[in-house]
Amino acid sequence: DTLILSVGLIPAGDIANGSGLAVDGRTRGAFVDEHYQTSIPGVFAAGNVLHVHDLVDFVSLEAEALASSAAEYLKNHALPPCPLEVRAGGNVGHVIPQRISGSRDFTLSLRVSRPMKAVTLTVTQDGREVLRRRLPKALPAEMLQLPIRAAALEQSGDLEVSVQ
């Protein structure tokens, strides 16, 4: 068993070099599913190793979700598969997680790619609107977090997140 802690602001992608761990080119951090499991089964990541966080509160929430997933993994020796991809669409810099199961509620974290006022954030699945939220503004320096209910999702079809 191993626990690696990386304390700092910028994602430490060099930890993944040579490990076979998939890295997201947009965040320069680990590629994770809704369980915060990386591309290597049983290896989990949260916090700034995924993407830069502006508030430690979000890091703490990710760590709690990761701990729950890691405990489930240790108990069952596996987690439900996450075949659905989550993609950053128009005006979105990146999204976390990059893969989901479609059968569990999860929190979507994202940053917009440019400052915007009076925005509409939309999550679609195969062109069908899953969530729409209006915001007075969105800034690249401020992470947005959105709870996504599994009941709103289909069991197949990738998701795209966009901001207009």
Language-model regions: role of each:
Residues 46-90, 95:
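A conserved FAD-binding loop/helix module that cradles the flavin
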Residues 128-141:
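Solvent-exposed serine/threonine-rich low-complexity stretches and specific carbohydrate-binding patches
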Residues 2-53:
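FAD-site-proximal beta/loop scaffold in flavoenzymes
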Residues 108, 121-123, 148-164:
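Short, aromatic- and glycine-rich surface loops/edge beta-strands on solvent-exposed regions
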Residues 106-115:
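Aromatic/hydrophobic beta-strand junction motif of beta-rich domains
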Residues 117-127:
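Beta-strand-rich binding/interaction modules
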Residues 103-105, 138-143:
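Solvent-exposed, conformationally flexible loop/turn segments
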Residues 53-58, 119, 131-133:
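Extended hydrophobic-aromatic, low-complexity segments
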